[in-house]
Structures are given as structure tokens and as C-alpha cells.
UniProtKB/Swiss-Prot annotation:
GO molecular function: chlorophyll binding; electron transporter, transferring electrons within the cyclic electron transport pathway of photosynthesis activity
Lineage top rank: taxon: Eukaryota
GO cellular component: chloroplast thylakoid membrane; photosystem II
Name the record gives this protein: Photosystem II CP47 reaction center protein
PANTHER family given in the database record: PHOTOSYSTEM II CP43 REACTION CENTER PROTEIN, PHOTOSYSTEM II CP47 REACTION CENTER PROTEIN
Keywords of this entry: Chlorophyll, Chloroplast, Chromophore, Membrane, Photosynthesis, Photosystem II, Plastid, Thylakoid, Transmembrane, Transmembrane helix
Originating species: Draba nemorosa (Woodland whitlowgrass)
Protein's job: One of the components of the core complex of photosystem II (PSII). It binds chlorophyll and helps catalyze the primary light-induced photochemical processes of PSII. PSII is a light-driven water:plastoquinone oxidoreductase, using light energy to abstract electrons from H(2)O, generating O(2) and a proton gradient subsequently used for ATP formation.
Length: 508
């Protein structure tokens, strides 16, 4: 036929069985990729330290999605929360991966079968004997089945009626585990951070889908609407399907980047806004203040801060710090976190406590400034020492650590103080191992960043695809050069441009 590469899909335009075949093959490829990717990730994943080396630091992409749906055990004998298990059951990480690969193989065989046996009675119109599809009826069937799946997920899987539940955690990502969730039917169900909304919205949307599917199965569209929306044209289906996909992609890009109950920070890492707003820093100070109010010493109060909470308050875990095109996991950027050194408290000669101004998200370098009270600069690490007034040496800054590995240790040596002041710009200070993965200090993004970038990019691309195919199906007659009100007999093939006698073909 000599079709250009961008038009090869026209071969299934009027061939319903082979249209079905290529869609089954697409499902085979998607399921096969998911299963294979899961097995690859399981081969390289280190589950030994869920606090300082969680899945999102290691660049895992499909494991977080499996985990949020209730998979926590491995046939390797480990649990995602760090424990060991003896009976992981069938639906472990490996079991789910294997099921996807088996399903992929079955879809592959089904696709071949439907490609070979394309001339089936079911695809023939009884009146004309030609292949045709009743698209409004197929729409009703798909809507009904997707409604059943949606309702079933919300009513059974999420609630635990028949299923494990989903991953639920506290606002600071410390106590996450898989648990059952009751539907939330009040206005709080619209809060994107309330897990109960996941159950209730799936139940409601599924019910609506079932009812809408039954409606479209039992009621035929009016002729004027059928013709106006080109409901008999398969390209209309393509256009509206692309619309559904790009809309969903935009939504999930938002819920991933800004955070929601469906994207827990324990599985995908913190959001950039939690760094920008000092979210974890405020919680840490609140806990320390509460400890001091209970007559604990400063050292005791800081020692009770969970290492997990302190680790979130580190700029290296900010997904916006990694470049979009820097390959590799976060561990490949700054190294594998080994331990929290503790919270550094800086003081000048007068004993005033100084605070290091933290680096904003979109800076790679930032002046090291130590402030007192309401932002009064008391010390810095100057760019030009000849003009300095507030250098660590001149001001006489010391640093003392509370909590962590250096609890109770203090330094007055200016070089050491400056080293820790520079590191305090990046949040809480951690010992990192750059040698194991040959990490060279350039931050990487987390799976949260990759997912957002990928889905936002493809959503934009698919938006233009929707416009393109929607225009083609609505204005098909215009693009083909046929006037819809044309009364004259048109001889196809007589003219280079249809119906234009000035472009009469020359006989060869």
C-alpha cells in the first residue's frame, strides 16, 4: 500500500477483528512491561533499611504502586517495612509480577488469534454483510464494565471487604502501613489527603458508570446527535478516548506533584512544597518544644526525633532539586544515607543562637548566612574575606550537636564550623556513603518527579492528539474535499482533487 509511517494505523480502520487484535497486543505489551520492570526492580532493590534507604531513594518506580495497593511481602522473605516473614502468600511482589507476565503471554496469543481469524460473523452487519461495529453499544458495554471494576475496587479492595486495603499513613509519613479504609461520605471526603475519599469516590463513580452503561445499552442516540458527533466513525472513538486519557494524566500529574492520599511520601518521597514551606522542620521544632515543656533536656528532646522525620527534612530528598534529564536514583546523586549526625546549633561569642538560612529549591549555590531572631545577620561565610565583617572567625561561632550520632559534641574550630554551616543550608545533616554507587554529589529527582514530568508531557501531547483526531472526524468531509450539499454525481478517481474538473487526471 505504501503508507507513510504516520498513517499505518489506517489498515485497521475498517477491520474490526484486527482493530481488537492490536488493542489486545497493546495490553500484552503494557502488562509485559509492568511484570518485567517489577522483576528487574526486585532484583536490584535493597529492603534492608526502609528508613534511610527507602524505595524512592533507590529509584523504584513500579514497587511503590504495588505497595500502595496492598502488596508488602516478598518471596525473598522480607517485608517492605523492614521485617522478615515466613509465609508471603501468592500475592507477593514476585507473584503480582508473574501474574502480569502470564497475562501478557495470554494476551499475546489472543492478539495473534484475532489477527488470523478476522472474518468472524460477530463483526458483520446482518443487513449489509460488511464488517461494522455498533459503537454506541460498545461504549455502553465498556462504561458498564469499567463501572463494575471501579465500584468493586472501592467497595471491596479498599474497604477490606474482599482485599487487603491500601497504604495509609500519618501526615508526616512515619507510621504508614497497609490497612482497610472506610468510605468517607461527608464533605471531608473531598480533601485529597483523606484516604476515605478514595473508597467513597470509587463507589460513587462506579455506581454512576454502571447506571450510565446500562443507559447507553438500552437507549439509542437520536439520529441528529449520532450524525452531529459522528458516532459511526471509529476516529470519534479514538478522539474521545485520547481526551479521557490526557485528562486522567493531567489529574494524576497534579496529585503526584502536589501530594495526596494516593501518593504517600513513604512510597514516592516528599514533595517540593514540604521543603519550601518548612513542613518537616516545623514538626521537628514542635516536637522539641513539647519535649522541653515536659522538662526534658535539649539533648533528650532532640534525641527523641525519629530519624525518618529528620531525613525528610533534607533538601536532597526534594524531587525538584534533581534535573529532569539526570539519569539514576537519588542514591546515585548524593550517596546512600548512613545515619543522622544530629541537629547543629550555632552560637556566637555572646551565646546567641544563630540559624543557618536554608537553600531555596531552585538554587544550586546560596550564600551561607547565619541569622539571629527576626532575620538579623550575625555571621556568614564570606565570598571575599578581605571585605568580611561577619565571618565565622571574626564573630567566633561555635556549633554543638543535639540528637543523632554526634549528640553532645561541639566544635569551635572555624573550618569545622563552616563545614557544618554549609551543610546545614541543606537541612538536617546526614552521613552519606558516596563510594558504593560512585555518587558525585549532583542531586537526582525521585520517582515523584519522573512520574509528574512523564504524565504532564504525555498529557500535553495527547491533548493535541485529541484536537487533531476530533477535528479530522468532525470535518472529514471538508478535509476530503467533498461538499456535503453536493447534488452532482461525483466520479471518484476522475480528478486529482475530488469534484474539481480543473484537475482532471491524464490518461496514461
Amino acid at each position: 500500500m505504501g503508507l507513510p509511517w504516520y498513517r499505518v494505523h489506517t489498515v485497521v480502520l475498517n477491520d474490526p477483528a484486527r482493530l481488537l487484535s492490536v488493542h489486545i497486543m497493546h495490553t500484552a505489551l503494557v502488562a509485559g512491561w509492568a511484570g518485567s520492570m517489577a522483576l528487574y526492580e526486585l532484583a536490584v532493590f535493597d529492603p534492608s533499611d526502609p528508613v534511610l534507604d527507602p524505595m524512592w531513594r533507590q529509584g523504584m518506580f513500579v514497587i511503590p504502586f504495588m505497595t500502595r495497593l496492598g502488596i508488602t511481602n516478598s518471596w525473598g522473605g522480607w517485608n517492605i517495612t523492614g521485617g522478615t516473614i515466613t509465609n508471603p502468600g501468592l500475592w507477593s511482589y514476585e507473584g503480582v509480577a508473574g501474574a502480569h507476565i502470564v497475562f501478557s503471554g495470554l494476551c499475546f496469543l489472543a492478539a495473534i488469534w484475532h489477527w488470523v481469524y478476522w472474518d468472524l460473523e460477530i463483526f458483520c452487519d446482518e443487513r449489509t454483510g460488511k464488517p461494522s461495529l455498533d459503537l454506541p453499544k460498545i461504549f455502553g458495554i465498556h462504561l458498564f464494565l469499567s463501572g463494575v471494576a471501579c465500584f468493586g475496587f472501592g467497595a471491596f479492595h479498599v474497604t477490606g471487604l474482599y482485599g487487603p486495603g491500601i497504604w495509609v499513613s500519618d501526615p508526616y509519613g512515619l507510621t504508614g502501613k497497609v490497612q482497610t479504609v472506610n468510605p468517607t461520605w461527608g464533605v471531608e471526603g473531598f480533601d485529597p489527603f483523606v484516604p476515605g475519599g478514595i473508597a467513597s469516590h470509587h463507589i460513587a463513580a462506579g455506581t454512576l458508570g454502571i447506571l450510565a452503561g446500562l443507559f447507553h445499552l438500552s437507549v439509542r442516540p437520536p439520529q441528529r446527535l449520532y450524525k452531529g458527533l459522528r458516532m459511526g466513525n471509529i476516529e470519534t472513538v479514538l478522539s474521545s478516548s485520547i481526551a479521557a486519557v490526557f485528562f486522567a494524566a493531567f489529574v494524576v500529574a497534579g496529585t503526584m506533584w502536589y501530594g495526596s492520599a494516593t501518593t504517600p511520601i513513604e512510597l514516592f518521597g516528599p514533595t517540593r512544597y514540604q521543603w519550601d514551606q518548612g513542613y518537616f522542620q516545623q514538626e521537628i521544632y514542635r516536637r522539641v518544644s513539647a519535649g522541653l515543656a515536659e522538662n526534658q533536656s535539649v539533648s533528650e528532646a532532640w534525641s527523641k526525633i525519629p530519624e525518618k522525620l529528620a531525613f525528610y527534612d533534607y533538601i536532597g530528598n526534594n524531587p525538584a532539586k534533581g534535573g529532569l534529564f539526570r539519569a539514576g536514583s537519588m542514591d546515585n546523586g548524593d550517596g546512600i544515607a548512613v545515619g543522622w549526625l544530629g541537629h547543629p546549633v550555632f552560637r556566637n561569642k555572646e551565646g546567641r543562637e544563630l540559624f543557618v538560612r536554608r537553600m531555596p529549591t531552585f538554587f544550586d549555590t546560596f550564600p551561607v548566612v547565619l541569622v539571629y531572631g527576626f532575620g538579623i545577620v550575625r555571621a556568614d561565610v564570606p565570598f571575599r574575606r578581605a571585605e568580611s565583617k561577619y565571618s565565622v572567625e571574626q564573630v567566633g561561632v561555635t556549633v554543638e550537636f543535639y540528637g543523632g550520632e554526634l549528640n553532645g559534641v561541639s566544635y569551635s574550630d572555624p573550618a569545622t564550623v563552616k563545614k557544618y554551616a554549609i551543610r546545614a543550608q541543606l537541612g538536617e545533616i546526614f552521613e552519606l556513603d558516596p563510594a558504593t554507587l560512585k555518587s558525585y554529589g549532583v542531586f537526582r529527582s525521585s520517582p515523584r518527579g519522573w512520574f509528574t514530568f512523564g504524565h504532564a508531557s504525555f498529557a500535553l501531547l495527547f491533548f493535541f492528539g485529541h484536537i487533531w483526531h476530533g477535528s479530522r472526524t468532525l470535518f472529514r468531509d471538508v478535509f476530503a474535499g467533498i461538499d456535503p450539499d453536493l447534488d452532482a454525481q461525483v466520479e471518484f478517481g476522475a480528478f486529482q482533487k475530488l469534484g474539481d474538473p480543473t484537475t482532471k487526471r491524464q490518461a496514461v
